[in-house]
């Protein structure tokens, strides 16, 4: 949520910054109109209350002098009724303003490149050599099916499209990756491991920005105001909802493994095969709470931690800065890590690392004190994938495939696979 004081004091400036995202921001003009009405109404109510006070004093004076005050009493009754009506209208306007404020996205940082789509994202760096196969590389869904480690048909029978059954060494590979990533972040990158609930309440989803704007993209539990998490960012960020942290605690860093659930309502027809876009998938999430002046530094640190996973696995990747039009709703700056996928001859997203600024902290009321006597300030929150597990499975199958269809296991994973070094 944006700082409403800044929005009111510099509306045109904020509007110009937000329009760098993708043009007109829905709800912004309505907010301005309503806020102007609110200010006018507050002034009117204050004038009416002042008038009521004056009339009350006049009535008291007349009564002291034992004079007729009936006409003034009638006038005061009318004024009181108008105040009551205006107060009700004011409450209605303020409720709508609060709802509108929840639908306005975050402001991009000044160094975020301007653009309208992913085509305008800026490449920052590359790592690793893409494999040079002497044969036509096969897509991961063909490899996994042939090895009998991925079963898309039975998953569709059990549930529907965009689900997968992992079998045998495929299931073991997924589990090995989760343990490898969690261990790496906890022991080498100094994160505190968290195992959060996979079901959260509405307040948590509002706190991190999924609701109210993106309710169609998440799964809601029928007859309960609970939601299946689309990412561990939701429960982990909300661990400190409504709290005031101590400045010396910051930065706070958590890593969490979770299964995630997304309806992918806006992705019909995209990535219908394989592991890239699933309704249910596993991911290791990184969440950081930071001092405001240190959050961009923390973004660089967190992005490096996600990169280290791909480096250790020997997977070629690149880092891109998302342009203004490709930023997510809550982000002020995002780096995407894109892993090389040989069958498509392109890089595909495997991690997004974002600085959210105080956007979530305002929604979830997460603050800190620099010292015991200082006024609480909003923290900055950051989150990133460290990394998406299913997409890592897909990348390993494709980048480590052999001509006979077997898959070499990356050396770093072999201790987690019982020293299995090849899938065949």
Curated annotation (Swiss-Prot):
This protein's pathway: Aminoacyl-tRNA biosynthesis; selenocysteinyl-tRNA(Sec) biosynthesis; L-seryl-tRNA(Sec) from L-serine and tRNA(Sec): step 1/1
Give the residues the record marks as binding L-serine.
Answer: 231-233, 285, 385
The GO terms this record gives for MF are: ATP binding; catalytic activity, acting on a protein; serine-tRNA ligase activity; transferase activity
**Which Enzyme Commission number(s) are on file for it?**
6.1.1.11
Keyword Nucleus present in the record's keywords: the answer is: no
- Provide the Gene Ontology terms for cellular component: cytoplasm
Entry remark concerning the domains of this protein: Consists of two distinct domains, a catalytic core and a N-terminal extension that is involved in tRNA binding.
Q: Which protein are we looking at?
A: Serine--tRNA ligase
Q: Can you name the source organism? A: Shouchella clausii (strain KSM-K16) (Alkalihalobacillus clausii)
Classification of source organism? Bacteria, Bacillati, Bacillota, Bacilli, Bacillales
Q: Which gene encodes it?
A: serS
